[in-house]
Amino acid sequence: MEFIDLKTQYLRHQAEIEARMQAVLKHGHFIMGPEIAELEGQLAAYVGAPHAITVASGTDSLEIALRALGVGPGDEVVTVPFTWISTAEVIGLVGAKPVFVDIAAADFNIDVDRIEAAITPRTKVLLPVSLFGQMPDYGRINALAKKHGLAVIEDAAQSFGATQNGKRSCGVTAISSTS
């Protein structure tokens, strides 16, 4: 298997990369500077979202999203066990309980047919994970969430750029997370 040649990519864009890095070094705004505002604008436009907020990691973005929704002790979050540990970890960090729904054999994403059975009066959020560049059926997931008065957070760490029904990953739910 041939790997991506990062050095060749760098050399192709070396002048632009170094000029942008020098600009950051000169103005000294290593975080929250104009380059970040530019990146956030480009990310939002790319996925068709009204806003994009960059943070340190995908893990941080999931935790921030849960906290912004007021998820805490006694709440449940429906997600999948077949994902990186951060997805379940942040649910526990905010004091909530992860409720696992198995994956569908066809695409390794959450089995949408099993979500409704996992919803209880304590459920606050559906947190499906898009894996291997594939997205679960967000039309059905969003409809279930609406029916039950739940929020949806898309964990799109592995699907940035994927599309479904003309919408890009990170633009199919009110809150999405990528890394």
Regions found by a protein language model. Give the residues of each.
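Generic alpha-helical secondary structure signal
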Residues: 12, 16-20, 34, 38, ...
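Conserved active-site segment immediately N-terminal to the catalytic lysine
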Residues: 154-179
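N-terminal "arm"/small-domain region of PLP-dependent enzymes with the aminotransferase-like
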Residues: 1-29, 34
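PLP-dependent aminotransferase-like
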Residues: 67-159, 163
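Phosphate-binding glycine-rich loop
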Residues: 29-76, 90-94, 100-102, 167
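Solvent-exposed, non-membrane alpha-helical residues enriched in polar/charged side chains
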Residues: 18-22, 40-44, 63, 67, ...
